[in-house]
Amino acid sequence: MKVVHVVRQFHPSIGGMEEVVLNVARQHQATSADTVEVVTLDRVFTDPSGRLSAHDTHQGLPIRRIGYRGSSRYPLAPSVLDAIRSADVVHLHGIDFFYDYLALTKPLHGKPMVVSTHGGFFHTAYASCMKQLWFQTLTRISALAYARVIATSENDGDLFAEVVAPSRLRVIENGVDVQKYAGQGATTPGRTMLYFGRWSVNKGLIETLALLQAALKRDPQWRLIIAGREYDLNESDLRKAIAERGLQDKVQLSMSPSQEQLRALMQQAQFFVCLSRHEGFGIAAVEAMSAGLIPILSDIPPFVRLASESGQGVIVNRDKIEAAADQVQALALHADNDFDTRRTASMAYVSRYDWKHVVGRYIDEYHDALGIPRVQEAVR
């Protein structure tokens, strides 16, 4: 069986969806005799002037890149039809042009397809009314072309239940590479928060600066590290926001750090902070907990569930910064006394998200889409 993953961004782009595709494909390839390929666009959205090679390999996975026109919000790439020609099963990632176009053209290509939701397209408030109309019409109709719609979180499951029949909707929460940063967080108590991920308005970075400002009134030892890559906020935007709040000596920016550099930053931090407005799942929070960082998270459903089930960290309201700062300071004071216990508990909880426990469910979906039983195979 050959499975072709179709995703708008992949290596060398870095992000949550890219990480999921990498791990599903890599684990599938490692545990079966099946063939796996990734089809993606030939430009990284944050550097659209640079065109990438049409064929590549990343961590043993073959990559085919295709051109596109239009914006990064809805890139038009009809040549995807040729790119999936050799597939037995197509696994779409995200609700975008590929999702709609491959559904529309299914009578032409005839490929069995499954799709992972990855939060849909509700990550920001941009064009929210139009998005709702699109979701209730085109997204609903396109879903009929897919053998299975795989919601990547309980939150997505509730959302897509509005437009997908229960018989074709399944929740498979994302796995996470919990070994990548395992145990890399600081081993002694302190007052350093770390954010890593996209530099996006959606991620609540401006609110995070406000939280730091309020926390410093309670304890002058607080620091913040913001690591990641530019998105709709760039380095200049963040430095301006930092300067406006007089936080130049309290905030460290690290743009596009390597994994080794991010590990080094984690070693300086005790807490992971993310005041995101929306997450389909929240991979970075799980990765941070695998490092032993204690989470400080916004009150959105995936984060509330993560904090509730793990019993770790605090959930704050990013619109009530003073109250949030009180919670964060109280958390730090408690952690001064039992930091090692909290650190160990965070790491232990997220072991359940290891990809080795998750990938078999995806392989089952591929076989169901083909209508053939799965034969268990020994790991190669």
UniProtKB/Swiss-Prot annotation:
The lineage of its organism: Bacteria, Pseudomonadati, Pseudomonadota, Gammaproteobacteria, Lysobacterales. It is an enzyme of class 2 (transferase). Pfam families: Glyco_transf_4 (PF13439), Glycos_transf_1 (PF00534). It catalyses: beta-D-Glc-(1->4)-alpha-D-Glc-di-trans,octa-cis-undecaprenyl diphosphate + GDP-alpha-D-mannose = alpha-D-Man-(1->3)-beta-D-Glc-(1->4)-alpha-D-Glc-1-di-trans,octa-cis-undecaprenyl diphosphate + GDP + H(+). SUPFAM superfamilies: UDP-Glycosyltransferase/glycogen phosphorylase. CDD domains: GT4_PimA-like (cd03801). GO terms for molecular function: glycosyltransferase activity. Keywords: Exopolysaccharide synthesis, Glycosyltransferase, Transferase. The gene is gumH. Its EC number is 2.4.1.252. Signal peptide: none annotated. The keyword Transferase applies. Involved in the biosynthesis of the exopolysaccharide xanthan, a polymer that is comprised of repeating pentasaccharide units with the structure of a beta-(1,4)-linked D-glucose backbone with trisaccharide side chains composed of mannose-beta-(1,4)-glucuronic acid-beta-(1,2)-mannose attached to alternate glucose residues in the backbone by alpha-(1,3) linkages. Belongs to the glycosyltransferase group 1 family. Glycosyltransferase 4 subfamily. The keyword Transferase applies. This is GDP-mannose:cellobiosyl-diphosphopolyprenol alpha-mannosyltransferase. GO terms for biological process: polysaccharide biosynthetic process. InterPro entries: Glyco_trans_1 (IPR001296), Glyco_trans_4-like_N (IPR028098), Glycosyltransferase_grp1 (IPR050194).
